[in-house]
Curated annotation (Swiss-Prot):
Residues 28-188 are extracellular. The gene is CLEC5A. It holds the Pfam family Lectin_C. The chain crosses the membrane at residues 5-27. GO terms for molecular function: carbohydrate binding; virus receptor activity. Highly expressed in bone marrow with lower levels in synovium, lung and bronchus. Expressed in peripheral blood monocytes and in the monocyte/macrophage cell lines U-937 and Mono-Mac-6, but not in cell lines of other origins. Expression is down-regulated when monocytes differentiate into dendritic cells. This is C-type lectin domain family 5 member A.
């Protein structure tokens, strides 16, 4: 039997498999156009979510590429959710309607990890989120009606909406003043 022919054949097969793998990985980056308006986006997750380990990374996030899950163009991907950070400003009600028009809601920031992720990408701007004060109950609720158990700073009698961004906290704000907004929806 001619062993060098078999080894040469195996090397060719391995090179073809490696070449095909690289082609499939980088082809979407070369031709980033799509007919449905979706594109691959950055993905953030804890180390344990990505690698199955129990120890988080030092900053709590690790950047990966997500090829199986997509968000619309200009939306950010995090933990199977898509987030849109607007550059325009409007009142809380207009912001809620804007998000609804995009098939989403104002962001429900109900975990410390989600808050950190959003604060890391909001820069030095204030953004409305889906948190509103119910005077009759004297408590804050998310727009999905779940109870907010955290603290809101800068509370004032006329401040019934909440923002995040400038500080590392939830800040009460007037619902009538114009701020940017964060919309949230499921990734596809």
């Amino acid at each position: 039997m001619n062993w060098h022919m078999i080894i040469s054949g195996l090397i060719v097969v391995v090179l073809k498999v490696v070449g095909m793998t690289l082609f499939l990985l980088y082809f979407p980056q070369i031709f980033n156009k799509s007919n449905d308006g979706f594109t691959t986006t950055r993905s953030y997750g804890t180390v344990s979510q990505i690698f199955g380990s129990s120890s988080p990374s030092p900053n709590g996030f690790i950047t990966t590429r997500s090829y199986g899950t997509v968000c619309p163009k200009d939306w950010e991907f995090y933990q199977a959710r898509c987030f849109f950070l607007s550059t325009s400003e409007s009142s809380w009600n207009e912001s809620r309607d804007f998000c609804k028009g995009k098939g989403s809601t104002l962001a429900i920031v109900n975990t410390p990890e989600k808050l950190k992720f959003l604060q890391d990408i909001t820069d030095a701007e204030k953004y409305f989120i889906g948190l509103i004060y119910h005077r009759e109950e004297k408590r804050w609720r998310w727009i999905n009606n779940s109870v907010f158990n955290g603290n809101v700073t800068n509370q004032n009698q006329n401040f019934n909406c909440a923002t995040i961004g400038l500080t590392k906290t939830f800040d009460a704000a007037s619902c009538d003043i114009s701020y940017r907004r964060i919309c949230e929806k499921n990734a596809k």
